């Protein structure tokens, strides 16, 4: 486990920053070509590599799927077509999401600078322990996403290639996989590499919102601890107590600035996913229920898990962030303010008023990002299954 030492909290004697929760995330970004060197010849070599995953994952795959449907539609079995179509729809969404994420990477960097200022406010070992646990939790979550996303790509590749078919049936102008076993495996490996670009780009677009909201929640917990300790030290003067309150207000403003900095980025990527999740999930479940054998079913179920992971954990964290604001308001009200000076009380009232406004992210300026919204858009999957059952479409396509 030494290879993945970042998934365990570092000892309190070791200095840890919030941004270290993104170490695995940024390593994956570096691998896919999103973080070039700042200068030197290697920067230009690296920029060429940046273009390769974009060329295949963002541009070639969406076009390749459509050409394949036009030229090879009559050769598809129902299961192969659904496997290809469910991924095709998701690939279009992933192309948009990864492009948005890449163009707005500067927002992540600026958010980390704001988080650095919050790290400086850690007052004791309890605060540091929360941040250490958060850093480990973020890296652990990214690792789980990596295993599941890569597991889907690998299982689909093997289940179809071993059955004598290309995994996603993407158009390839240079190879006809029907020419023999060698051509089949060349096509399958080419599709796997190309799809791996898209899968990793999609993973990066899906994980950064979760990573950063986990960080925001950790600092909200630290802030709640600081609010609980207000005016609890009898040795501190009223001026010191007032400064402690002001620091809490400033910390809350910094957390709001973090959310505002990353909000336009999250709004766009989650809106794209909300728009697609129902149809992709529905087609995948139809494929599992009616057209898959065991191993292809395993690959499709892994795809279902990846689709659910794209939004559900983040939406749950958004719900918790809303609850954190309410909890913080309660902590402020229950703090030791009764015999405080008028200036302290006036500032406390204003602080509590601002805290009562929950931190909400809006997808595309339309859907509040929450578990309720996620479940609502995901319900469309069951509508697709109902239509297939009532019209006996599965039997007609057998």
Curated annotation (Swiss-Prot):
It is a multi-pass membrane protein. GO terms for biological process: detection of chemical stimulus involved in sensory perception of smell; sensory perception of smell; signal transduction. Keywords: Cell membrane, Glycoprotein, Membrane, Olfaction, Receptor, Sensory transduction, Transducer, Transmembrane, Transmembrane helix. It is found in: Cell membrane. This is Odorant receptor 59b. The chain crosses the membrane at residues 47-67, 85-105, 142-162, 180-200, 270-290, 294-314, 349-369. The keyword Ribonucleoprotein does not apply.
């Amino acid at each position: 486990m030494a290879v993945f030492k970042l998934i365990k909290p570092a000892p309190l004697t070791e200095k840890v920053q919030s941004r270290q929760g993104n170490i695995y995330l940024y390593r994956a970004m570096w691998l896919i070509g999103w973080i070039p060197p700042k200068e030197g010849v290697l920067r230009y070599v690296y920029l060429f590599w940046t273009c390769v995953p974009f060329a295949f994952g963002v541009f070639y795959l969406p076009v390749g799927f459509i050409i394949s449907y036009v030229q090879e539609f009559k050769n598809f079995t129902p299961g192969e077509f659904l496997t290809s179509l469910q991924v095709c729809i998701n690939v279009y969404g992933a192309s948009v999401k990864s492009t948005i994420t890449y163009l707005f990477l500067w927002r992540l960097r600026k958010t980390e600078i704001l988080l650095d200022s919050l790290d400086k406010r850690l007052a004791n070992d309890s605060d540091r322990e929360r941040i250490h646990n958060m850093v480990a939790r973020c890296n652990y979550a990214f690792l789980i996403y990596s295993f599941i996303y890569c597991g889907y790509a690998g299982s689909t590749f093997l289940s179809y290639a071993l059955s004598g078919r290309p995994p996603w049936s993407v158009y390839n102008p240079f190879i006809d996989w029907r020419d023999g076993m060698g051509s089949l495996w060349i096509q399958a490996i080419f599709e796997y590499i190309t799809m791996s670009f898209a899968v990793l780009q999609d993973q990066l677009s899906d994980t950064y919102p979760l990573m950063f909201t986990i960080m925001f929640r950790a600092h909200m917990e630290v802030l709640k601890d600081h609010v609980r300790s207000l005016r609890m030290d009898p040795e501190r003067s009223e001026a010191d107590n007032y400064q402690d309150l002001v620091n809490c207000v400033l910390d809350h403003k910094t957390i709001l600035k973090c959310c505002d900095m990353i909000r336009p980025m999250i709004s766009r990527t989650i809106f794209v996913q909300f728009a697609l999740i129902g149809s992709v999930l529905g087609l995948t479940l139809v494929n599992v229920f009616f057209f898959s054998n065991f191993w292809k079913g395993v690959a499709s179920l892994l795809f279902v898990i990846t689709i659910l992971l794209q939004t559900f954990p983040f939406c749950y964290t958004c719900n918790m962030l809303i609850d954190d604001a309410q909890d913080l308001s309660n902590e402020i009200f229950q703090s030791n303010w009764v015999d405080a000076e008028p200036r302290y009380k006036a500032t406390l009232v204003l602080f509590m008023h601002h805290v009562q406004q929950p931190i909400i992210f809006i997808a595309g300026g339309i859907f509040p990002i929450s578990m309720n919204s996620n479940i609502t858009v995901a319900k469309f999957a069951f509508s697709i299954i109902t239509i297939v059952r009532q019209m006996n479409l599965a039997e007609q396509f057998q």
